[in-house]
Amino acid sequence: QKSTLDEAINLLVDKIHSVQPNEIAGHIGDMINMENALSFKKFFEKLKSENLEFREKDFYINPDEKMNYIFNSSIAGIEEADLILLVGTNPRYEASILNARIRKTFVQKKIPIFSIGNPGDLTYEYEIIGDSTEDIKKIVNKEHDFSQKLLSAKKPLIIIGESALELKSGGYVFEEFKKFLTKNNLINENWNGLNILVQNASTVGLLDLKILQNKKEKSSSFFHDLKNRKFKLLYLLGS
């Protein structure tokens, strides 16, 4: 049914007034600019609804500080690394430019590259050292052959993909690697090789805007309530 802009706005207002704040939810798409996202956030604050989300899948993220959700070493910093560990990621398909930089570094410096999980052909050699959270547990507890290699590196670089963060153990994976690197001074004022490889262009900006605030639990109420059809009004912003 065709309508004018005013008619559409009036219909939206009527719908909003007909439901309770906890029955309204919003989802922000991956290509939305930050100005619109901020306005959307303020709009939901006016509605007194906390049901605002941008993730397409329910994966763990800790928004408490920026280093928890960015690529800390930078792409250029890959060339400074003396060891690379991929955790639940295939950079060839998830970030081709980044993968090209890894390949360049491998070809020029012959640095060792390891992976937890089998990402397939990455165009350079790597060694699979595990495929489960149990292997990560052994690494951070210094019970794995790889542990000493990681501790011996001066600038180790770890790339954690969303596939790892989507696991029930996603929070453990990130937090334990962060704790391990910090405790052993592998995160310091000169180097931070703990990197999160996000899939959507807007993710970092939306986290900077505190869209998730302190909701770092993987099983967020948004996805649970959406699955159980508890929302009566779902507002999509470029989603």
Describe each model-derived feature in a short phrase.
Residues 1-239:
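Catalytic alpha/large subunits of respiratory electron-transfer oxidoreductases
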